[in-house]
């Protein structure tokens, strides 16, 4: 959404906390992460445990009468709305606009006559039907729907899995931008009508064509102060997650064409390179954060927990400039870390990179089976960590293939250590292969011989981060101090 000279964006965050990241840009190219609209996910107790692939689906970001609005669908609970006068927050608690199973991908529209509407899709896994779009009238304050709505588009015959609709009014037409065909191999469809409830005409306005940008999937249309039109959308890049693309929009005869029509078939293809948007000026390069020196009183905005966090999991000591993770017990009957809530993770920032961290491990003297270290997490995972055992401290490397199905870890390396301070490293290649290594002095690193092919998460890419877990119950915990978390690319 654009407000004046400023652009704002949010995205699906599923089950992680904090959720609904808020990004700000001056030119649609350089984006700064400025906060999150959802510090905790509701219902709180439900999301105190990892709910992979659930939670926040396909939000819409809007600005209306001096306030910012975010609408999102939770497929298990319904359609929620949050609002704020400042996009940095504070944001209101999520308000349930419509309760129901399988209600997803909402997008509001405030019309010129003061009436309001909401378009949404359905998740077949909960609703028992998909590939349809519904428009309902909404109270102008955005808090609830005034009717059950009407099906305005049926994609079953030619546009299966149409979803992620975004609602606009432009030059007398109601437009719904919506991808169809699925995340991996879909295309962008646009619907238009002079009447909010239809009938709607439709046209395919962008597809993969001869490019290597598969999808292209959900996104939003925005204009610049200079009158240009652009479309931001995501591409499913497997283990690297859903990466963002920017494409030009050109209008002809009341229809948008997104990207460039290279073969004159009337359908745009995503651009790999293009001039930047003309926003009336130039702006400095800005990128979302990744490295963290832990020299602030708060975690960097790039970090997210696997579930709603407890305030006893982490402490940043600005005097010592380190992050302390206290161990917390593994969930009952956990066969691996897939359902562990207290994993501190962040997205992959590039196709190839190296992460370094320095850790001092101080486990409890009660021999609780504590383990702390570095992890790459997805539907499978690999970790390099220090672990306390009955006969001392060990450096261990473990992999859980098919962790999502309960597969136990396999130990590929274990070495007894004479020190509790260790430098841990992982490097990711362009092909998505991770190698782990360690050092006791920060200069000479020993590589773990077993490489790990990175596996994506549930509708997200793989993540990298830190953890501290224990096997047993006690009245206190040990801890691990991390001096930094540094990326090099």
Q: Where are the regions that the model predicts?
A:
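Carbohydrate-active catalytic/glycan-binding domains of CAZyme proteins
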Residues: 1-489
């Amino acid at each position: 959404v654009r407000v004046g000279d400023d652009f704002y964006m949010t995205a699906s965050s599923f089950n992680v906390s904090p959720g609904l990241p808020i990004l700000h840009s001056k030119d649609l190219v350089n984006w700064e992460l400025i906060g999150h609209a959802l510090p905790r996910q509701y219902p709180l107790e439900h999301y105190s445990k990892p709910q992979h692939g659930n939670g926040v689906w396909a939000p819409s970001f809007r600005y209306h009468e001096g306030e910012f609005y975010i609408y999102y669908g939770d497929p298990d609970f319904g359609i929620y709305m949050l609002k704020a006068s400042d996009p940095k927050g504070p944001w209101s608690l999520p308000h349930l606009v419509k309760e129901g199973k399988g209600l997803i991908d909402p997008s509001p529209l405030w019309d010129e006559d003061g009436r309001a509407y909401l378009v949404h899709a359905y998740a077949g896994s909960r609703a028992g039907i998909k590939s349809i779009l519904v428009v309902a009238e909404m109270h102008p304050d955005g808090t609830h729907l005034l009717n059950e709505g009407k099906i305005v588009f049926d994609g079953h015959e030619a546009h299966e899995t149409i979803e992620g609709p975004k609602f606009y009014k432009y030059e007398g037409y109601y437009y719904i931008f919506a991808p169809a065909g699925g995340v991996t191999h879909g295309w962008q469809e646009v619907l238009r009508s002079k009447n909010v409830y239809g009938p709607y005409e439709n046209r395919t306005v962008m597809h993969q064509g001869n490019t290597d940008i598969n999808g292209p999937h959900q996104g939003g249309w925005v204009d610049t102060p200079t009158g240009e039109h652009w479309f931001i959308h995501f591409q499913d890049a497997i283990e690297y997650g859903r990466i963002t693309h920017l494409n030009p929009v050109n209008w002809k005869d009341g229809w948008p064409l997104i990207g460039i029509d290279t073969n004159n078939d009337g359908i745009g293809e995503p651009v790999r390179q293009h001039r930047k948007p003309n926003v009336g000026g130039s702006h400095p390069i800005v990128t979302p954060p990744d490295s963290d020196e832990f020299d602030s009183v708060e975690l960097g905005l790039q970090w997210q927990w696997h579930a709603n966090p407890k305030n006893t999991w982490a402490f940043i000591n600005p005097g010592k400039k380190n992050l302390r993770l206290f161990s917390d017990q593994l969930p009952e009957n956990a066969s691996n870390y897939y359902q562990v809530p207290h994993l501190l993770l962040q997205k992959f920032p590039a196709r190839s990179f190296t992460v370094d961290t320095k850790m001092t491990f101080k486990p409890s003297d009660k021999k609780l089976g504590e383990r702390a270290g570095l992890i790459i997490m997805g539907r499978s995972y690999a970790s390099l960590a220090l672990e306390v055992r009955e006969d001392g401290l060990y450096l261990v490397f473990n992999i859980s293939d098919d962790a999502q199905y309960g597969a136990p870890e396999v130990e590929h390396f274990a070495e007894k250590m004479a020190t509790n301070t260790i430098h841990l490293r992982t490097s990711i290649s362009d092909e998505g292969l991770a190698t782990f290594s360690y050092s006791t002095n920060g200069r000479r690193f020993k590589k773990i011989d077993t490489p790990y092919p990175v596996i994506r998460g549930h509708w997200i890419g793989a993540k990298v981060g830190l953890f501290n877990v224990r096997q047993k119950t006690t009245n206190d915990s040990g801890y691990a101090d991390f001096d930094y978390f540094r990326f090099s690319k």
